[in-house]
A protein has these predicted regions:
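N-terminal periplasmic "start-of-domain" segments of outer-membrane beta-barrel proteins
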Residues: 44-79, 106
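Extracytoplasmic beta-strand/coil segments of soluble accessory domains associated
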Residues: 83-125, 147
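Short acidic/polar hinge/loop motifs at secondary-structure boundaries
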Residues: 125-153, 172
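Face-selective signature of the C-terminal outer-membrane beta-barrel domain
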Residues: 299-461, 484-496, 534-540, 586-589, ...
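Membrane-embedded beta-barrel scaffold of Gram-negative outer-membrane proteins
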Residues: 312, 318-324, 486, 492-498, ...
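C-terminal beta-signal and adjacent terminal beta-strands/loops
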Residues: 588, 646-651, 674-748
């Protein structure tokens, strides 16, 4: 009966019988007939979890968190990206450029954007080192290779990489399987969406070695015109395991080709009458007719290679060593009209005595980067102490360059003329120690100290051909502390404090060379209540910022959000989540977040003069977000869920302008899953162990809503030379109306 409402799934009778075919894919495959196998599988689980133990917390930790396992992901995994699968967790708002959850998607947690959310995979940082963003489009169908994930709200525990600045997502990939198994999964749906997945595991060969893998392709035409996606990916791992050792060598890769849709819609008439209209690739031909360039695409591939060695020495000591290499390379391609030769370092063209200073052209902007990471973790645990020491070093080397692949007038360019070249190098070293001390059966204390050293240097030209030279070094000290109190077996109370510091990203420096690092002091106070048929979590948070890099609402030429320091700001909120088993077959799982998110003082330029707007709302931070799941399980294997989401109104800028407001919306999805399980008890075991049928109707009530957009201003100095007038503009990303996905998975 699990839905993606983590930490609140209920132990009702309908969950008591978990199919063997599902358990084959769990990290701790358990044979119900063999106690020895059960012990082996438990050891496997413990060894696998060492991969993420340094960055995760347990159920009674004073850190606000949600856990999601493979079973919960499986019921909705029909091709949509991981952010969409997490949409119903507390304080989460998801967005998608193409409107249907395939391609470029995003997630905000407590209003905190992707650049401030730390993502790790097996303890290895996944955020892009320069932009600090997370590009889920490069991990097509990665949910099919996830064993579990933990979403921490607030600063959370010390982690590797750029660090959490308000939220973190820690992912553990597929665990070692005891027995050989395989899956074939296919799904189809609206907008010509289809997903094809093949998975396998050899099981443990000679009781020690397992090889497992996945091959996937997802294709979709998208809800927005021409916003097609073609995502190919694989996951492959080889593992060696014995009683105290787990060694994993794994590689996963994703290649995405997506037609661009990051322009959104600014024309309100189009938004009303033709909300799927896409301006990307638009140009005017020689006959004055509007055309669309057919290869206005984003084309990028990312390859990951990881090696992990987990070692348990006894019941107290364990270590983890992790190595990573990531190779990323790709470009986005654009047709551009009437571009000045001078903007590309080219000379004007003279033809028949006429000087031509502009041309239509097709350009590509490239990224070619290498990322290396080394992690080391040591854990000591006894009945009183749980202590972790960890260190991580990351090195990033990224080339940025642009090339012209076609021009109406070639000027003095060469084939694939580079019109800018730049480079960014970043080092990231951190060391941390964290400990939980159990005073007695009721009280426990938590402490966490981290020091992080960051160096960032750029050379060459920006994409606008402006010299771009940054040489910055930062030292950050991030202390954390907390206390947890178990009143009894049903009630747990906690309080925590955490500080986070974070460096600006590449885009921040391009927009403002004097940008400052940001700092967050996070206070969390919570109560967890647990009964057999009722669970209830309440958490209050106060996040106090200094120089928070808030989204201005504007985007750059490739759809990346523009940020700026906001001085003093804060987020104050209350999160409530619950789960109630009405009967053995029916449950309700609601959650909501009520918050106020404010810049303490906002000064802007309006109509040529500086204006103090005083206290304003932080952009993209709705004051009310709620979700609910009505779950009905009439028979074993069948689950019907009505999932609902409400997001209150929000501002896309920090000026409280009506022009920047996004309306509230309420949407519901209907999810049905049925697993037909074939008996494995008789001698003639069937070849197919089970068939899982899944259906999903998104936006059941056909709401025409907008979950994301952008807002900008500029000064009009030409209409009246004696007056400056500030002009406002906004663009919107319409989301899909009612659509569906259906799928079938055969498990062998």
């Amino acid at each position: 009966m699990k839905i993606l409402f983590a930490n609140v799934s209920l132990p009702v009778a309908s969950r008591g019988k978990i199919p063997i075919s599902i358990l084959l894919f769990f990290s701790c495959f358990i044979s119900v007939k063999a106690q020895e196998k059960q012990q082996d599988s438990t050891q496997l689980k413990v060894l696998d979890e060492v991969l993420v133990q340094a960055v995760r917390v347990n159920a009674t930790s004073p850190i606000t968190h949600s856990n999601v396992d493979k079973e919960a992901l499986e019921k909705r995994n029909l091709g949509q990206d991981i952010p969409i699968l997490l949409n119903y967790l507390p304080s989460v708002v998801t967005t998608t450029d193409v409107g249907a959850g395939v391609g470029y998607t995003g997630i905000r947690i407590r209003g905190i954007n992707a650049q401030s959310t730390n993502v790790t995979i097996n303890g290895i940082p996944y955020n892009d080192a320069e932009s600090l963003g997370t590009f889920w489009v490069n991990l097509g169908d990665f949910a099919s290779s996830v064993e579990s994930l933990q979403l921490q709200r607030g600063v959370g525990t010390s982690t590797n990489g750029s660090g959490a600045f308000g939220a973190s997502v820690n992912i553990l990939t597929d665990a070692v399987s005891e027995k050989a198994n395989a899956e074939i999964s296919n799904s189809f749906g609206s907008f010509n969406t289809r997903k094809h997945t093949l998975k396998f595991s050899t099981g443990k060969l000679n009781d020690h070695v397992e090889i497992a893998g996945r091959l996937s392709q997802i294709k979709s035409d998208g809800y927005i015109d021409r916003a097609a996606s073609n995502l190919k990916s694989y996951f492959l791992q080889a593992s060696y395991v014995d009683d105290k050792t787990l060694i994993k060598a794994l590689t996963f890769s994703g290649k995405e080709v997506t037609y661009q849709s990051w322009n959104g819609l600014e024309d309100l008439d189009l938004l009303k009458n033709d909300r799927t209209y896409n301006t990307a690739g638009m140009y005017t031909d020689a006959n004055g007719e509007t055309q669309f360039y057919d290869n206005e695409v984003d084309n990028y591939q990312q390859d990951h290679y990881q090696l992990h060695w987990n070692q348990r020495y006894n019941n107290n000591w364990s270590t983890n060593v992790g190595l990573n290499y990531t190779k990323g390379k790709g470009y986005f391609e654009q047709y551009k009209e009437d571009e000045a030769f001078a903007d590309y370092g080219l000379e004007d063209v003279v033809m028949g005595g006429e000087t031509i200073s502009e041309t239509d052209l097709i350009r590509r902007r490239w990224l070619d980067n290498d990322y290396y990471v080394a992690n080391l973790g040591v854990n000591y645990k006894n009945d009183t102490w749980n202590i972790d020491f960890g260190t991580s070093y990351g090195y990033y080397d990224g080339a940025h360059f642009g090339e012209i692949i076609w021009a109406q007038y070639a000027s003095n360019s060469e084939i694939r003329h580079h019109y800018y070249d730049g480079n960014g190098k970043k080092t990231d070293f951190n060391v941390f120690g964290k400990a939980t001390y159990r005073l007695n059966s009721q009280w426990s204390l938590y402490g966490d100290l981290q020091v992080r050293f960051v160096g960032y240097k750029t050379t060459g030209l920006s994409s606008d051909r402006i010299p771009f030279n940054v040489d910055e070094n930062y030292t950050f000290f991030n202390p954390k502390a907390g206390v947890s109190y178990n009143l009894n077996s049903n009630n747990n109370f906690y309080f925590s404090y955490a500080r986070a510091n974070r460096e600006p990203n590449r885009d921040d420096f391009e927009n403002n060379q004097t940008v400052k690092p940001e700092q967050l002091n996070d206070f969390e106070l919570g109560w967890r209540h647990l009964q057999e048929t009722f669970r209830f979590n309440v958490n209050a948070y106060y996040m106090l910022y200094n120089e928070q890099l808030v989204l201005t609402g504007n985007i750059d030429g490739v759809g990346n959000p523009v940020r700026t320091n906001s001085g003093k700001s804060y987020r104050l909120g209350l999160e409530v989540e619950a789960a109630v088993a009405i009967t053995d077959q029916f449950s309700v799982q609601p959650n909501f977040t009520l918050s106020t998110n404010k810049n303490k003082e906002t000064i802007v330029s309006q109509d040529g003069a500086l204006t103090n707007l005083g206290k304003t709302n932080i952009s993209f931070s709705p004051s009310f977000v709620a979700a609910n799941a009505l779950v009905y399980s009439p028979i074993n294997g069948l689950q019907v869920s009505l999932l609902s989401k409400y997001v209150g109104e929000q501002y896309m800028g920090n000026t409280d302008s009506e022009k920047s407001k996004l309306d509230s919306y309420f949407v519901s999805d209907l999810n049905v899953s049925y697993e037909l399980i074939f008996s494995q008890d008789n001698e003639s075991k069937p070849f197919v162990k089970s068939i899982l049928l899944t259906g999903l109707v998104n936006n059941l009530f056909n709401e025409k809503y907008i979950s994301n957009g952008y807002y900008y201003t500029y000064d009009d100095t030409w209409t009246d030379p004696n007056q400056v007038t500030t002009i406002e503009g906004a663009g919107y990303y319409p989301q899909a109306t009612t659509n569906f996905l259906i799928g079938a998975t055969l498990k062998f």
